[in-house]
């Protein structure tokens, strides 16, 4: 899915509001995913995935940090996510069907917390961006 100039502008603009809140946004998105889609928990055996766990917050910060990197390299997400895609495919062996699930939950959290800035056009652009990231992450599985 090709991001238009407007999409790129919208994603960068909304991401300015994400900065400084990476941990909270990431943790809430992960927690929502684990609660609503419990099969996604299988990749985190013996980890505390409760809402306030330090592991969940640390991993959430890492996830949103990776997305911040994708925003910074929005014209070449393939290259920016190449190593991360390799890791998820070869080392972690995460089912690529889970990437869109997390993308959906990130979209929900952004919509809740950034409501005044999360217009319909921003929603569409961020959805396309997260879908692109999910596609790139799954690309090494082929």
Swiss-Prot record:
Q: Where does heme b bind?
A: 88
Looking up InterPro entries in the UniProt record yields: Globin, Globin-like_sf, Globin/Proto, Hemoglobin_a-typ, Hemoglobin_oxygen_transport
Residues noted as binding O2 in the record, renumbered to the chain: 59
Entry GO terms, CC = blood microparticle; haptoglobin-hemoglobin complex; hemoglobin complex
Note the SUPFAM superfamilies from the entry: Globin-like
Q: What does this protein do?
A: Involved in oxygen transport from the lung to the various peripheral tissues.
Give the protein's recorded name: Hemoglobin subunit alpha-1
Starting at the broadest rank, the lineage of the source organism is: Eukaryota, Metazoa, Chordata, Craniata, Vertebrata
């Amino acid at each position: 899915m090709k991001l238009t100039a407007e999409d790129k502008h919208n994603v960068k603009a909304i991401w300015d509001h994400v900065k400084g809140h990476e941990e909270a946004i990431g943790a809430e998105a992960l927690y929502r995913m684990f609660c609503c889609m419990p099969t996604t928990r299988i990749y985190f055996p013996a980890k505390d995935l409760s809402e306030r766990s330090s592991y969940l917050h640390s991993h959430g910060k890492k996830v949103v940090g990776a997305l911040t990197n994708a925003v910074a390299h929005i014209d070449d997400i393939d290259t920016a996510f190449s190593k991360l895609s390799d890791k998820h495919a070869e080392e972690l062996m995460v089912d690529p069907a889970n990437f869109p699930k997390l993308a959906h939950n990130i979209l929900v959290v952004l919509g809740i917390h950034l409501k005044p800035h999360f217009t319909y056009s921003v929603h569409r652009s961020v959805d396309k961006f997260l879908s692109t990231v999910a596609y790139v992450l799954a690309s090494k599985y082929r």
